[in-house]
């Protein structure tokens, strides 16, 4: 009788567990922006010391930035879609750690992070276990998995 109860308890534990995945594949994770290339001029800037990080999980993308590698408690939040090698960011918010998040309606807030529209579309040029390269009409953004 005891064996039956153990088997029943084990069976209930197994069927009660759910394996949930986001379906984002290699895009999921934490990425450090390492370089920004300006397409019009061919210029390039090393951004590793800027401490700009993109975190991707579920259907949210968070951009965190630091000063001297110290997180300030603020960042940006976006909804995103990944369709046919196109990454679309939309619904931007300023994320405050201890306050209510605020919707963004001024694109100037986003430009330092390589985003030039409130609904921005990036072509995914490279995406593997270690690197990601995104391009829009203005910039090419290089990331390394962090």
Residue ranges and their predicted role:
Residues 2-7:
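Sec-dependent signal peptide recognition
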Residues 13-16:
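C-terminal motif of bacterial Sec signal peptides marking the signal peptidase cleavage site
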Residues 18-24:
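Bacterial lipoprotein signal-peptidase II cleavage site
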Residues 26-42:
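Tryptophan-anchored aromatic micro-motifs
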Residues 32, 61-62, 86-88, 133, ...:
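General beta-strand recognition
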Residues 37-48, 57-127:
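Contiguous, well-ordered beta-strand patches that form the walls/edges
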Residues 77-83, 127-146:
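Edge beta-strand at a domain terminus
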